[in-house]
Amino acid sequence: NHFKFQRPYGSYVMENVLFKISFPAEFHAQTACEAAFTLHEWMAQHGKSVDQIKQVTIRTHEACIRIIDKKGPLNNPADRDHCVQYMVAIPLIFGRLTAKDYEDEFAADPRIDEIRAKINCVEDSQFTHDYHDPEKRSIANALTIEFTDGSKSPEIVVEYPVGHRRRRDEGLPLLISKYQRNLSRIFDKEHCQQIEAVSLDFDRLKDVQIDEFLTLFVKI
C-alpha cells in the first residue's frame, strides 16, 4: 500500500484556519454558545427565566461529546472551559461569556451548576458526518430549552462558528477589531497605528522583511 495525501499540495490548511473570535470557549462549543446567546434573548422577549428551565438539549457532533461533555465537579478554569454544559449555562443565565466567568469566585454562583445539571448532549449523526467532511468542516450544535410549564423554545441551530471559513465576511471585521483591541492593551495609540498600517495592508506587508515586521512588536 502506498501512502497518498487527501489532496495535492496547496493552500487548503490556510484557507480553512479557524479563528477564535466570539467567545473564550473551546472550539467544539463555539456554536453552542452562540445558540445559547440567542436563547437568552428569546427568553427575555417571551417572559421566560432560567428558573423555569426544566431541561436543555444540545444536539451535537461526536467530538463535542467525546471532548467536552462533562458532568460532576469542575475544579478550575481549565475544567470549566472544556465543559460544554458550563459554557452554555453562562450565556443562558447572564447573556455573556468572558474569561472572568471561568474563575473560582464566579463559578461559585449556585445557579451555574443548577443549569449545568439540566443540560444533556445527544449525538446527531449528520452533524458528526459534516464535522468530518473536508469540504464542510462544520462544528454544529443545536439547542432547545424545555420549561417547567411544558412549553419549549424553538431549536436554535448554528452549523459554523464566526471564525469558520464559511463565515469569513462576517468574521474578518470582528477579527480585526479583536486584533486592534489587543494591540491597544500593550502599545500606545501611535505605535498601534504603525503596526496596523503595515499588517492590515497586504501589498505593503508582503514587501516588509520579517525582522522589520517583528521589530514593530517590540515595546520600548
Language-model region placement:
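Terminal-appendage/accessory-domain detector
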Residues: 1-220
